[in-house]
Amino acid sequence: MFSNFFGSSKRNTIASSSSSSKKDKDNGKDESSKLKNSGSSTLPKPITNNESGNNFITSPSVSSPLISPLSSSPSPLLSSSSNSIQSTSHQQQQQHQGVITSLQMKPSCTSLTDDIEKKKQAKYDSSLEQTARKWVCDVLEIQLEDDKTFYELFKNGVLLCRLINKLRGGTIKRINESTISFKQLENIENYLKACKTLGLQSVNLFNSIDLHENKDISLVITNIVVLGKHASKIEGYNGIHLAGERKIIKITTTPVSPLFGGNHNNNNNNNNNNNTSNGDLSPVSITSASGGSSNYNSYSNNPLNKSSNGKKAKWRKSVKIPAVSSLNSDIRTKEAFKFSPELQKAAQDWIEEVTKEKFKLPSFSSSLKDGILLCRVINTIIPNTILYINNGNSSFKKMENIGNYLKGCLVVGLKKTDLFDTPDLFEEKNINFVISNIHVLGNHVNKMYSHLKLPLIKNIGNGGNGGNGGIGGGGGSDGSPLKMYSSIIHSKFGNGSSNTSSGNGGVIIPPEDMKDLKDWINHHLRAHHSLQIGSDMSNDLRNGVTLLTLLEELTLQKVGIFAREPVLPWHFMQNICLLLNFLRENSVHNVSDISPHDLFNGDIHSLCMITRLIRENFDTDHQMKSIPMDTRRQKVIEEIIATEQSYVKSLSTVYNLLIVPLLNSLDTNSPILSNDEISSIFGNWEHLLRSHINLLKEFKLKLNLPFNDLTIDDSNQNQNHNNIFGDSIFDSNITIGDVFLEKCEFLKDNYTNYINNYDNSYQRVKRLKKSNSNFEELVNTFEIFQDTHNGLDLYSYLIMPIQRIVRYILLLKEVIKYTPSTHPDYQMLQNAKENIKRVADHVNESKMAVENKRKILSIQDSIQNLQFNLMDKERTYIREGFLEIEDTFKKDSYFFLFSDLLLFVKYKPSEETGKEFKYKEVFYLDQVVDVSDILSDDEGEACVDGDDDGGEYEGGNGDATSGSADPEDQTLRRSCNSNNNNNSNSNKSNTVYSFEIETCEFSLVLLAESHTEKIEWMEDLRSCLQHQLIKEEDQLSSLSLSDNDDDNDADADVESSLNSISSPLLLLNNNNIINNNNNNNNNNNNNNNNNNNNNNCKNSNININSSIDNNSDNNNNDYDSKINSEENGDSSDEENKTSNRRSVSFKTHKRLESDETISDTESDDYELVCGRSKKSQPPPVPPRKITFSDTIKNIDNQ
C-alpha cells in the first residue's frame, strides 16, 4: 500500500507463484475468454488516460521483475475498443486483489528537484535566448559559439561587463578575466550594479547564483533582453538596441460631453453607434462622427488624434507610464488636469458683477482667500445673512469669513455636496471645488432668485449669457456638480488654441526676447540633441520635458520623477505640475500667475515667462553677466578670504578640542594616547594651523582689513563670512597673487607629509576607537559637540587638508577669469596658480610613491618562503595576475611584475601562515632580451584576413620616430582588433593567447586568459625593459664619456648619429651594428609572415656577443644577406629600410645608412655589451635556447 503511494522502487510486492502459473499462452483468444481462463487474482491490463492524453498501462500482479515493463509484445487489450474497457472497469475493480508494482505505476508525487527543473524548462524560451545572443553579438561585434550553452558563455561575467561598457564607456573599471569563482562572481555583481546605474528596475535583475550556478538561466536571458530594450534610453549610446523603431503614437480619446456646448445629439449618436455592448469598454473615436460640432472638428483635426491613413486611431494600451511618483504629486496633477481657466474666468466675472468690485490681485485664489468678497456675494443675495465680515489680516479671521460664506450658501439653498472645505480655498488644496461651488451658486440664484435680476453666469459653450442654461448648457438639469470637474483639455489637446486668439487678427505676437530664450535653452541642452528647440517653441516646451531637463542641468540635482516621453495628456500635466511645484519651492518669485492650463495648451507668453523665471533663479552665469567685472573679482576675493577663515577655524577646532587634551594627558599617569599615536593620527596638524594663520593675516593686511592678532588658542573664534569688506571700499587695483607667491612655499613640505600619513591616520582612528575606550569617549564627545554646529565628524575634518590645495587652484582660476590681462595682478596670479599646481603634482607623486611602498610591502607579506627582500631596492609595482606556463597545465601560476623583475609564485593559501602565495622563481629584467608575441593558428588566420582593412596606424609610413610603425607592433594591434571580429570566432574555444619572454639562456612561454590581457602584459613588460635599459645606458654613458677628454668630439659624433635613429645614447660597435641591421632587416623580411619574433641574441640590434670573431660574423652576414636577397628579390629597398626588429623592449626604426657614421679607428671604443663595459664582459658563449617548461618541474619540486 505504502509502496504504491510513494512510488518506491525498493518495495515491490510479488504475486504468488500459483497466480503466475496461470498465464494464458494463447494470444489469439478474445478478451472475455482470457478473463475466464485467468485465475481469480489475474487481472487484465487496464488503460487509464491522463490529462495529456497519454496511456498508462498497469501490469498485473503476476508480472515478474525479470520481465521488462516496456515489452514490445502487443497486448490483446490494446486492440480492443475503449467501450469494452469501460464496460468491464467495474468488474476489474472488484476482481483486483493483486498488488501493482511501483515500476509499473506512475508515481503519485514527484521530487522537488524534478518540479523545479520542469518549471525552469517551462519558463525557458529558446527564441528569447536567440534574441539575447544576437543582440550581444551585434553590440560587442563578436560571434558567440553555437555549440556552447548560454550558461557556459556568460558564466564568468566577462561578456556582461563588456556589454555594459559598450552601452556606457567606463562604467565597470576592472573586468576580472579569470577562472576563479569569486572573481567571476565579482564580475556578475559589477554587472548587476551597473544595470541599476543605467536605470533598470530591481524586478528585471537576477541573483548572481542564477547565472554562476545555473540556478535559473531564464532570468538572465530576460535581463539581457530588457537591457537591450532599455539601451535606447541610455544617453550617449547610439548603437543597436531591442526597443524597435520609435514611433509617434497617435491617440484619440472621447472627451466628456462639453460643459457649455450644444450639439449633444451628435455625441450621443456616437456613443450609441460605437458602444454596441455593455461589455465593450473601448473608447469611442470622435473622428467617426459625421457633422459634429466645431469643437469636435477642431479636435479631430489634431494630428495626434488621427492615424497616418486617416482612419480612427485606437487607444494604445501599452503606453509607457512614468515611474511611480508621490501621492501628493498625483493629487496636484489630477486637480490641475481638471482645472479649466474658462470656468474660473466666468466665476470671477460673475462675482465682480454681483459685488461691483474688481479683484484686487491677479490671482483668483489670492483674491478670494480672505473670504470678504464671498461674504458680500451672500449678503447681496440675502441681505444681512452675514452680520460681521472680518477685515483683519490674521489667518483665523480669514478662515472665519470663509466658514461664514459656506453657512450662507446653505441658507441660500445649496446642498452640502455643493460646498467645499475651508482649506480648499485658504490653503489652495483644491481650487476646482471653489470654482464649482461658485458656478452652482450662480445657477441656483438665477433659477430660485430670478426676481433679484442678478447677472447671469456665462455659458462657456457659446460664450454668451444663456438664460437658465448655466452649467452644461442645460441649466444644471442633470443635477450633477461633478460635471464641473470634467476638463476641456481633451478638446484642445495638441491644438495650442491659446496661441491663436482673435486679439490681433488671430495671431499672437511673440515676446521680444523669445529668440534669446530659445538660444539660451539650446546652449544649455546642447548635449541633449533630441530636446533642442526648433521653430515651434510653443510645441517643444508644452510637454514640460525640456524645461525639467533644463532645471536638472542648471541645478545639478534631480527635479523629480517625470515622464521623459509623454504621450497621454496626463503625462503632459504631470510634468507641468512638477515644474511649477519645484519653482514654487525653490524660487523667490511667485508662480501663481502662471496657469498649468496655459502651459499645457502652449501659450507662448506663459512659456517665455516661466523660462525667464528659470534663467533668473538658477543660471548663475547669466546672473554674473549683469555684474561688472570688478564686482565679480571682488566676490571671488571675498570667497578666498572667507574660505581661508573657515579653514583656519576648522583646523583650530580639532587642535583645541582633540589634540590639546591628548597632549595634556601625556603629563598624567594614564595618558589617553602615546605621543607616537597622536602623531600617527594628526601628523603635522599644528604646523598646518600656524602656517594658515599667517597666510590669513597676510591676506587681511594686504586688503587693509581689520585683523585681530590671532593665536592658535583663539583662532576658532566666530568670523563674519557674509561681508568680508564691510563698509570699506574695495580697491580694484589691489593684488593678492604676490601673497600666494610669498607665503605658499610651506604647502609643499607640510602637505606632502600630511597626505602621506592620511591613510595611516584614518585606519589608526578606527582601530583605536575599538581598542581604547578613553579615546573613543573623547572622539564621541567631540562629534556630539560638532553635531550642534555643522554636523561634521572627525573623518570629515581629517580630509580637509587634502582638499585644500585643489580648492586654491579652483579659486585662483576664478580670480584670473575676472581679472583683466592688463591688471598688475594678472601675471602674478598666473604664476601663483602654476606654483600651487606644481605643489599638487609633487604631493600626488609623493602619495603614489608611498602607496607603491605599501603595496610592495603587502605583497611581500603575502608570499611565503620569499628568498629576498622586495624593499631592498627602489622598484615600482606594475601589475599582477594569473599566467599559465606552457606545457605545465597548471592554473595556479601567479606573476607579479615590478619595474626591474618578474616574480613567479604559486597561489597556495596557507591557514598556518595566513599567506596566499608560495615563492617559486624570480626573473630579473636586465637578463631579458626580448618579449615577443606568439600567434596561435586562429589568431594568425584572423591577422591575415584583417590585413586589408586593418586601418591606418600611427607611423605606418615608416617614420623613424613612430613606435607603432614596426610590422610586429602592427601585427599585435591587428591581432587585438581581430579578436573583436567575426572572422576569429570559429575555433575560439581552442585559441591560446601566448607570448614569449626570451633571455640568452632560455625562453619562457606564458599563456594569458584573454587576448587583451596578453597585450597588456606585453606592453607593460616592454615598458619596464625600456626603462631598465635606459637607466643602465645612462649610467654607462656617464662612465664612458668621462674616461677620455680627448675623445669628446668623437663622442659627440656618436651621440648625434644615435640621436638620429631615435634611440638612447649607447656604446655601439659600428661594423657589428651595420652588419646586424642588414642581417636583421633581411631576416625580418624573410620571417615576417611566420611572425617569428624569437631571433637569436646574435641577430638582435643590441650586439650581445660582441666578442665573436668579426670575420666570422661578416662572412655569415654576407652569406645570409646573399641568400635573403635572392629569396626576397621582389622586395623593394624601401621596404628593407623600414623593416623593423623588436629589440630589448624598444625599436630601432631606422638603420644606419652607411659605414661612414663611425670611423674604423673609433669602432673599437664604442661597442654595446649589454649595458656593461667590454673589459668586464665574460668570454662569449654561443647562446643556447631551451624552453622554461623543461625546468619548471624542478622548481615545483623545491
From Swiss-Prot:
Q: What is this protein called?
A: Rac guanine nucleotide exchange factor B
Record PANTHER family: DH DOMAIN-CONTAINING PROTEIN, FACIOGENITAL DYSPLASIA PROTEIN
* Residue intervals passing through the bilayer: none
Q: Which gene encodes it?
A: gxcB
Gene Ontology molecular function? actin filament binding; guanyl-nucleotide exchange factor activity
Q: Where is the DH domain?
A: 632-846
Please name the source species: Dictyostelium discoideum (Social amoeba)
Looking up InterPro entries in the UniProt record yields: CH_dom (IPR001715), CH_dom_sf (IPR036872), DBL_dom_sf (IPR035899), DH_dom (IPR000219), FYVE_RhoGEF_PH (IPR051092), GDS_CDC24_CS (IPR001331), PH-like_dom_sf (IPR011993), PH_domain (IPR001849)
Q: Name one GO biological process term.
A: actin filament bundle assembly
